[in-house]
Amino acid sequence: MGTDVAFVKMHGLGNDYVYIDVFANPAPEDPAGLARRLADRHRGVGGDGMILVEPSQVAAARMRMFNADGSESEMCGNGVRCVAHLIVARGYAAAGPLTIETGRGVLAIEVMPRGPLQSQVKVDMGPPILLARDVPVEH
C-alpha cells in the first residue's frame, strides 16, 4: 500500500519538476527514493526531478532539489523560479523582492505575478562558473 503525497508539477523554460510543499505537508522520509519514483517518465509523474519547498531560517523559503536519479543537487535556475512563484501564489511570501535558500547559497529574486498561474521571475544567480575545474563534481 502506498502513501499519498501532495505535489504540484510546474515547468520553467522546459525544466519540469515535481514540487512538494513542505510548508503545508510533512517532508518525505526518503526524498531521494521518492524523487526516483515520481520523476520516472514511464511509471511516475515524470520530470527532471523533485524539489522540496521548505521553510527557511534565513530566507522566504528553502529549496532542496533532487535529480531524477535521486541524487541531490545544489539548485536549478528554472526550478528556483518556480519555487518563487509557488511561495508567492500560496501566500508564504509577498510578490516583489525576496530571497530563497538553495544548496548554492541564498539567492536574490524578484517575483512579478502575471495571473494566478504565471509569474515573471528574475533571479540573481551570482557569478557564473566558467572553468571546468571549478565545477563541483562528485566521483
What are these model-predicted stretches?
Residues 37, 138-139:
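Short, solvent-exposed amphipathic alpha-helical segments in soluble enzyme
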Residues 104-138:
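Catalytic phosphate-donor-binding core of small-molecule kinases
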